[in-house]
């Protein structure tokens, strides 16, 4: 089960190390670069997008530079401080993706790159249900996750003492089943192999959904 306090503490402790490690990682990930560019072209210029689990804001930064009207939330206050420092022109705030402070049918796009990695499958369903609630009809969700099975307990994440958290791997078919139960329109389900020596060596999935 998702331990909100543990995850918050982990990223509060690891915020600076995380930014140092990952803020510029898109430069070495052409697939991610391309899929985010593709997503940005689905968003009309006046519509708003929110990134959940934004970390230091590397995904929001990329989308902002593509002309997307984006903001970001993260459960970690320290991560939000880092994101604001690195991206002073983007609105970031502390928030919970399981309880978005958004009205029903109020936003056109939601991005969640590896933001579900601490959830169990039932909690993934809750997150997607919350995304659907906030999304305008015709709006999009783009999210990604590590493919596999089981839970990986991590101690001292990024060598930061007491930054502990459980990372969860998912099978694509299990996530797809959840999506279909929520009656979200699957636009694309794409997988890729890891970039060797550049990232954690798991296969990854990227899913684009549309609210009917």
Segments from the language model and where they lie:
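Conserved class I S-adenosyl-L-methionine
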Residues: 1-44, 142-166
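Class I SAM-dependent methyltransferase SAM/SAH-binding core
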Residues: 50-52, 56-99
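A short acidic, Gly/Pro-enriched loop at the edge of an enzyme's catalytic core
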Residues: 98-110
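A short glycine-rich, Lys/Arg-flanked "PGG" loop and its adjoining helix->strand segment in the class I
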Residues: 125-137
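Short alpha-helix
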Residues: 167-182
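Conserved S-adenosyl-L-methionine
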Residues: 184-195
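Core SAM-dependent methyltransferase catalytic element
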Residues: 195-212
